[in-house]
Each structure stands twice: as C-alpha cells, then as structure tokens.
Amino acid sequence: MTESVVCTGAVSTVKEVWEERIKKHHEDVKREKEFQQKLVRIWEDRVSLTKLKEKVTREDGRIILRIEKEEWKTLPSSLLKLNQLQEWQLHRTGLLKIPEFIGRFQHLIVLDLSRNTISEIPRGIGLLTRLQELILSYNKIKTVPKELSNCASLEKLELAVNRDISDLPTELSKLLKLTHLDLSMNQFTTIPLAVLDMPALEWLDMGSNSLQQLPDTLDRMQSLHTLWLQRNEITCLPETIRNMKNLGTLVLSNNKLQDIPGCMEEMTSLRFVNFRDNPLRLEVTLPPSDDVDGEEEQELFGLQFMHAYIQESRRTEDQVNCLTHTPSSTRSDG
C-alpha cells in the first residue's frame, strides 16, 4: 500500500512538471509570436515612413505632405517623425480617420483631407493653434467637436458634402479669425447660432441643406459679403436683411420664395443676386437689352430683375389700395 501511495505521488509530481513545461512552452511561443509581430510592425512602419518621406515636398517655403489617389486607410505613428510638416494634402486615399496624434503636429497651417471616408474629427484637433485652413469636404463626418474652437488662427473651414452634419457647437463663435465657411450639402435646418456670432465671417455657403426660414438675427453677420443659400426650402426673407450693409453677393435660386421684400432696395452694396427657380407670385419681364452681353448679365445677375419686381409689387399694391378705397356710387338719377 505504501508503494502505491509513493507511485501515485510520483505520477502527480511528473504531471505537474509536464504541465509547467507545457505552460512555459505556450508562454514562450506567445512571446515569440508577439516579438515577431512587433518586428513586423516596426518594419512596416519603417517602410511606411520611407514611402511618406517620398511624398514630402517644399513649396513656397512650406513643408507639404501630398498624397493623391493612393490607398492610405490609416496613417502610421511613424509619421510623428515628420512633425515639422506645415501642410497635409491627402485626397482620395480612402483615409478612415484622422489620427489621434494629430495634435502633436504643432506647425500645421493647412490640413486638407477632402474626398476621403473620415467619419469623425478628433478632439485633439483643438491643439493645432497655428492651423489656418481645415478642409474636410466630401467625407462622412456627422458632428463637429467643440474643441475646434481652440484653433485660434483658423481662417477657412470647409465641411461641404458630408451630408449628415446638422448643427455646430456654439463654442465655434470663438473663431475670431474665421472668414470663410462652407457648410453646403449637409442637413442644416437653420443657420447655427455659432455662425451668426462669428465676427469676421465674410463668405458663407449653406446651399443644398434643408433651410426653411432665415433667422431675424441674420444681420448679426455684419462682415458678410457673400451668402450662398441655393437649393433650400426658404419661403421668405426677414426684413432685417436690409441691415447687411456689406453683402455684395446673395444667391437664393431653387428655393420656395413667393416674394421679394421691398426693403432690399436699401442694400446698396448688392452686386449679384439670383432669384431663379422660385415660385414668385408676380411675373416680371425685363425690357430687352441692346446687346447680347447685357441679356446674359440680366439673366445671371438678377439685380435689375429684383428692382423691377419690387417696383411691380408696389404698383400692384397701390392699385389694390386704390380699388379698396374708391367710394362706390349709391345715388340714383332723378
């Protein structure tokens, strides 16, 4: 019986030893695999960095990374070795996301990642205090982080054709140098408060959205000289539009406007307006022009049409008032 106990104990010990050896072997294999994977990543990063370096050029004194129509769904961390870059120009690369380490490129002046498949803007974007241009048109972005308001040098922001952006954080009104904003072809139903409060904004495109009404506070954009609102569902214009003294270009084609407010005659800075393809209640025909160029200008600019429409509207209104106030004769002869 004693021999049986000793034998059982020996077997148990041998089993434990073998289990320990097997466990150690598995761990060694795992470590070896991880080491090999690490070597592969290091090698791939080096290869990627070499490829990226080939895409770096100097133009007008700026260091630019330019990639066109070449697949780069992600950008490797080895790109950080090129942190002196001042411009990224990556178009049609299939890029899925802006890297989280973007904030470490403190020298960036222009970030142009248009025509990719980017779905979000990382909060680290706010660390780019020297950034002057951010161009993210033709992507799949749905929201804009409030941290973007920390890009104090930003002058140009393009978010066109992302199709699903419907609002902007109010913090973006802190972008005191922003002069150019393109929000066309998205899902905005009104002009965001942040936009109305951007003090330096000169150029705004909100065409091809779902705007139905323009806010009465539209005239807060006193620096605005160009406003594109084509292809929306706008039904009327606020009277306060007369106060936009610097507005020179106003495009309202393909909307649901039924009238042109008479106060627009006071907008002496207007040089280009377009009311084409609106269900206006009055039909106004301009007198023929003496030359072909003049006819093209009439049709394209619409400024003469606007003034003619307002005059016709007033004339029609005067006729209605006259008919309303004409006393009817109730006396009979004899």
From Swiss-Prot:
Matches recorded under SMART domains: LRR_TYP
Tagged with keyword Repeat: yes
InterPro entries: Leu-rich_rpt (IPR001611), Leu-rich_rpt_typical-subtyp (IPR003591), LRR_dom_sf (IPR032675), LRR_domain-containing (IPR050216), LRR_R13L4/SHOC2-like (IPR055414)
Gene that specifies this protein: Lrrc39
Compartments it resides in: Cytoplasm, Myofibril, Sarcomere, M line
Assembly information from the UniProt record: Interacts with MYH7 (via C-terminus).
LRR repeats: 59-82, 83-105, 106-128, 129-151, 153-175, 176-198, 199-221, 223-244, 245-269, 272-295
UniProt-recorded name of the protein: Leucine-rich repeat-containing protein 39
Gene3D superfamilies in the cross-refs: Ribonuclease Inhibitor
Signal peptide per UniProt: none
Principal location listed in the UniProt entry: cytoplasm
GO terms of biological process kind: intracellular signal transduction
The protein's role, per its UniProt record: Component of the sarcomeric M-band which plays a role in myocyte response to biomechanical stress. May regulate expression of other M-band proteins via an SRF-dependent pathway. Important for normal contractile function in heart.
Entries under Pfam families matching the protein: LRR_14 (PF23598), LRR_8 (PF13855)
Keyword vocabulary terms for this entry: Cytoplasm, Leucine-rich repeat, Muscle protein, Repeat
Induction: In cardiomyocytes, down-regulated in response to biomechanical stress.
Cellular component annotations (GO), alphabetically ordered: M band
Tissues showing expression: Expressed in heart and skeletal muscle (at protein level). Also detected in kidney (at protein level). Not detected in other tissues tested (at protein level).
Keyword Metal-binding among record annotations: no
